Amino acid sequence: QGVSSAASDVYKRQYIMIGMLVTGVAMVCGLMFYVVDRNVTQKDNFMEIGGERKTVQLPSCRVLKLTQPPVVWKQKKEGIVEAERMFSFGEVPLEVTAGDSLQQGSFSYAGDMEAFMSMTSVGDTLLVTFDFPEDKLEQHLQNDIWIRVRSEGMELRLPAEVQAVVVDVEDMEANFYGLRCDTLSFRTRYLARLEDCHVTALAAQAQSLHLNSGTVRNLYLNLDEIADWDVNTGSFHIDTEHLSGSRYHRCLLQKNECRRVFWTPLKDDASLSVELKQAVKIEVGE
């Protein structure tokens, strides 16, 4: 009986070990399937747009706006909206520079992008619209909600008359280089950088704003529209910062960032808390 009991215990332990081994193998296989499936999904939601680089001349305009339909709703049953589709341009940076020696404007991009864009003039505004209808999507993208557009960077050379640039495109970085003008305003959905820009009066609006090099005499910022902003005080110089907002805001003024700050509350309960690194003249408007 003792021998039989011992043998039974051995068999039980073997069964337990085999069960644990099978469970472990199943878990590893499941994890590998998840990782592979996740990587395939991440790769598959890229929309690659190539083609020979193309440059088109821009007509005269005062406002230049890049835009896209913000969402596309998929309706599979009458009255029922099941999903939305968005196109991210995080892989397509935009460079904004001055026009050529004749101060003419142009727009450069990958040639195949032309199938998904259009240019129209409305008054003094030039609209560049990016649109991706479902019948132009590859089969593997037609069930995706979030599609990432991947293409070479775009270059926008501004006509001399342009006073405002709007980049109303999801996740597109806008990099402003070498601009020299009296007045300019820009608005972007995402990130904006300024390099070697010299502007007398600049109104800037971006989710994330980085002033890296250049000069601005009067900088206008509505803090309601900016999540974060920074100034490289070693290479970017500001005379007066005109700050506004409709709620409570805080800001840090670095040493040598500016000479004066003018705060304009947009509501009665709006306020600005300022941390100073050196003496700065601060004025409050009504």
Question: Which residues fall in each region the model found?
Answer:
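Single conserved hydrophobic/aromatic residue that forms the stacking wall/gate
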Residues: 1-11
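Short intrinsically disordered, low-complexity coil segments enriched in acidic
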Residues: 5, 15-17, 213
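N-terminal leader/targeting segments
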Residues: 7, 21-27, 46-50
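Sequence-level detector for tyrosine residue identity
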Residues: 9-11, 15, 34, 40, ...
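Hydrophobic membrane-insertion alpha-helices, especially the h-region
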Residues: 15-34
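Short linear S-[DN]-x-LW-Φ motif typified by the pepsin-like aspartic protease active-site region
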Residues: 33-180
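Extended, compositionally simple hydrophobic/Ser/Thr-rich segments
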Residues: 63-64, 72-73, 147-286
